[in-house]
C-alpha cells in the first residue's frame, strides 16, 4: 500500500479555510499549515488568528507563521517536513524559487479567477467591477512570477447581474476545493499536464483601495452600479449627505438626468441620484451610527434628509 501524499497547506482567509477543510477530509496527510502571523482586529485591536489557523488548531495540525519565507531558517523548517506537495490558497506571502523547489511535486495554487485574466490580489471584486460575464477558479502549478504558472484545471461560474463581491466569493470558495482535489490526483498519477498561460491576455487585479470606494457621481451609472456590487461587503461604497458619510450597499439603474450627485426623486422604491450618464436608484443605505437599511425604511423615518435637489458628495 502506498503512503498518502504528505501535503503542506499555506493560506490565510476564509476562502483558504474552505480549501483546507476539503483537504482534511481527503486521504492525504496534512503535515503542517502555514498562515500569516496573527493580526490586530476589531475595536479592541486584539490579536486574532486567521481562519486557517483556527481550523488547523481544531484538527491539531502544526501551524507555522513565519513573517517571511525568504529566511534560510524558515526554508529549512519547511524542507524538514519532507512534503510531497504544497497547496497555496490566498496565503499572502511570496514563495521564492527555493521554496517552490522543496516539495517533490512542487507547489500548486487555487486562484479565484479564470487566468490569465485577473492575476493579482483582488480578482473577485475586479471581475464584478469590470462587468465580466463569468469567473471561476484556476488551479495552477506555481512559479516565481505572480499567478503566471501553468494552468492545471479551471472551474467556471457565470457572474449574474445580482452578484456582489461577497456572493461571488462564496461561490468560488465552493468551486475551488474540489478542483484542487482533482488537480492533486492528476499530479500524483502523472495524468495532468499544465497549460502555459498566454501572457498577452493577462491583466492585473490591483488590491482594493478604500479611496476607490468613494462614489464619483460624474461617472456613468452602470459603472457605479457594478462598483457598488463589487465592493460589497468590503470596503463598501460611500458618499456624503449633508457632510455625513452615507454608505451605499445596493443600487440599480434608473432613468433620469441632472447635475451629477443630485437627488432627482425619493420614494419607497429608492433614492434616485443623477450620474454622469443616466441615474442610479439607491435601495440599501447606512447612515452614521446606524445599521444597513432598505431605503423604504429610511424613507419612512428620515424623509427630510432626502429632499429633491439635495446633492450627494459635497
UniProtKB/Swiss-Prot annotation:
Per the record, its GO cellular-component terms are: cytosol
Keyword Protein biosynthesis annotated: yes
User: Recorded E.C. number(s)?
Assistant: 2.1.2.9
Signal sequence coordinates: none
**Superkingdom of source:** Bacteria
Q: What class of enzyme is it?
A: transferase
The name on file for this protein is Methionyl-tRNA formyltransferase
Give the originating organism: Pseudomonas savastanoi pv. phaseolicola (strain 1448A / Race 6)
